[in-house]
Amino acid sequence: MTGGVPSLGFACQPDAAEALERWGRWLEHERGASTHTLRSYRADLAGFLAFVAEHRGRPPGLNDLGALDLGAFRAWLAARAADGAGAATRSRGVSGVRSFFRWADRSGLLHNPAIALLTAPKAQRPLPRPLAADDAALLLEEAAAVPEAPWIGLRDRALFTLLYGCGLRISEAIGLNRSDLPAGAASVRVLGKGGKQRDVPVLPAVREAVAAYLAAVPWGGGRAAPLFVGAKGDRLSPDVARRQMRHLRALLGLPDSTTPHALRHSFATHLLGGGADLRAIQDLLGHASLSTTQRYTDVDAEHLLSVYETAHPRARRQGHQTVRSVCDALPPRLRNQESER
């Protein structure tokens, strides 16, 4: 499979291996699947085929896969559960296997009606774990305290301020190029999951943090250059960003749940607590389904009741605009009406 995803060996016959590679290319190029999804699906299919090979006594081909009954699929799930795989992991495995079988059916390679009868385990998704408002503000203020090189500290502050001020995923933030967030820009264009683009308003606090970082970074570059870079000038790795966050939370005594993604959760939770419309938050986060965004309404009331009056902790810092300005920048159809509050 292309796209930088490492190849995994499949315990199967050549015809099935070729089909799996074609399916992987289809996922990547036609469906716009992320590297994480590609890697996970390949691992799930590799485990499934290894299970089938072990229990049939030989690596399966396409004909063997087409002949599997519902009991075989259920036995695989039972084996995964016995190995300690949780409901969420098994549910994702079913999604990956089902995706391959459906693609193979549409491609005329095999037909297996049993896969349509396989139900995925119900995974109880954990509630988002946002930071308290004061902790989020403290983290952004102290974000430059960890690195030895001043420009790296400014980079971390700019990155974490962007995550919190715009609600981006870490992959979206480090995927930005300089042209995506030009100086003084009122919004940033983000390429989200499935290759979907969205425009997110940018607060002055975010613009100021990014400008300070760009003024200090020793690596140049044109509009196509990555916005966030590592110590050698290459595009910043998400693992480096997570490591910097671990160091920072240890320094500040913040809980282990303080991660780059927690800043995205905090963005949504604090906006909701300030009265932002749920559909506006859905658009800002790039959620395909409103039900995903609705999880934030179930977050512990302690988080919502402790939110300040105007919607965002950055509003308490002199010279910084509140996140209500993000809502004001949205189309009228996305804003709460007074009669609805």
From Swiss-Prot:
GO terms for cellular component: cytoplasm. One of its GO terms (biological process) is cell division. Forms a cyclic heterotetrameric complex composed of two molecules of XerC and two molecules of XerD. The keyword Nucleotide-binding does not apply. The gene is xerC. Keywords: Cell cycle, Cell division, Chromosome partition, Cytoplasm, DNA integration, DNA recombination, DNA-binding. It comes from the Bacteria. The keyword Aminoacyl-tRNA synthetase does not apply. Site-specific tyrosine recombinase, which acts by catalyzing the cutting and rejoining of the recombining DNA molecules. The XerC-XerD complex is essential to convert dimers of the bacterial chromosome into monomers to permit their segregation at cell division. It also contributes to the segregational stability of plasmids. This is Tyrosine recombinase XerC. Residues 126-309 form the Tyr recombinase domain. GO terms for molecular function: DNA binding; tyrosine-based site-specific recombinase activity. Residues 14-105 form the Core-binding (CB) domain. Transmembrane segments: none annotated. Belongs to the 'phage' integrase family. XerC subfamily. The active site is at residues 169, 193, 261, 264, 287, 296. It is found in: Cytoplasm.
